[in-house]
Amino acid sequence: MATVLMINASDRLEQGVSVKMYNQFLNSYKEAHPNDTVEELNLFAEKLPYYGNTAITGQYKKAQGVELTGEEKEIVETIERYQEQFLNADKVVFAFPLWNFTVPAPLITYLSYLAQAGKTFRYTETGPVGLVGSKEVALLNARGGVYSNEEMAALEMAANLVRTTMAFWGITQPVEVIIEGHNAAPDQADAIISEGLENVKKAAVAF
């Protein structure tokens, strides 16, 4: 039995294509792997505190054995709770849209919680080394425009951001399913989304 962490990074629960991808993957995975444990995490619903001075100072003080303020202690414990959940999962699925060239803010915050030396990577004399390379990861991304061509590729900072972050942590071959172009070609949107969701289903069964 595997533990699978399903992460939804969109609050467009009725209209969002990445949410449709999330739901398709979730249902198909459960059907194909009935004995696995699935944990769901909706990042917008979690209302994650921003990763800023309080969090950074609190983590530094804890590492140095210095007493934390109440506010620092609260956010450090929050960060550690999400770290533990991620690290304990055998498989992790990220479902997220591209909004204004990048990912929604809660996903940035969540990745910041996880991107901690000694947790997901460590420093060595020859450079940083990922610590979670054995974890299986799937990336489900929806983007209304077409960013797979050379002209637009440099503007794609959603899938590329998450993919690069995973690689830094040692996860170099995530499963990826991308649905793109449904807003750019509305007359083809249904077909584009339908084909993409079929690819999501296949990925879930094989994951």
Curated annotation (Swiss-Prot):
Keywords noted in UniProt: Flavoprotein, FMN, NAD, Oxidoreductase
Pfam families linked to this entry: Flavodoxin_2
Enzyme class: oxidoreductase
GO terms, molecular function: electron transfer activity; FMN binding; oxidoreductase activity, acting on NAD(P)H as acceptor; oxidoreductase activity, acting on NAD(P)H, quinone or similar compound as acceptor
Enzyme Commission designation: 1.6.5.-, 1.7.1.17
Binding-site positions, FMN: 10
Highest taxon, organism lineage: Bacteria
Substrates-to-products reaction catalysed: 2 a quinone + NADH + H(+) = 2 a 1,4-benzosemiquinone + NAD(+); N,N-dimethyl-1,4-phenylenediamine + anthranilate + 2 NAD(+) = 2-(4-dimethylaminophenyl)diazenylbenzoate + 2 NADH + 2 H(+)
Free-text comment on the cofactor: Binds 1 FMN per subunit.
The keyword Chloroplast belongs to this UniProt entry's keyword annotation: no
Reported cofactor(s): FMN
Keyword field contains Flavoprotein: yes
NCBIfam families per UniProt: PRK13556.1 (NF010075)
Function field: Quinone reductase that provides resistance to thiol-specific stress caused by electrophilic quinones.
Family: Belongs to the azoreductase type 1 family.
Subunit (UniProt): Homodimer.
Protein name: FMN-dependent NADH:quinone oxidoreductase
Natural source organism: Shouchella clausii (strain KSM-K16) (Alkalihalobacillus clausii)
Gene: azoR
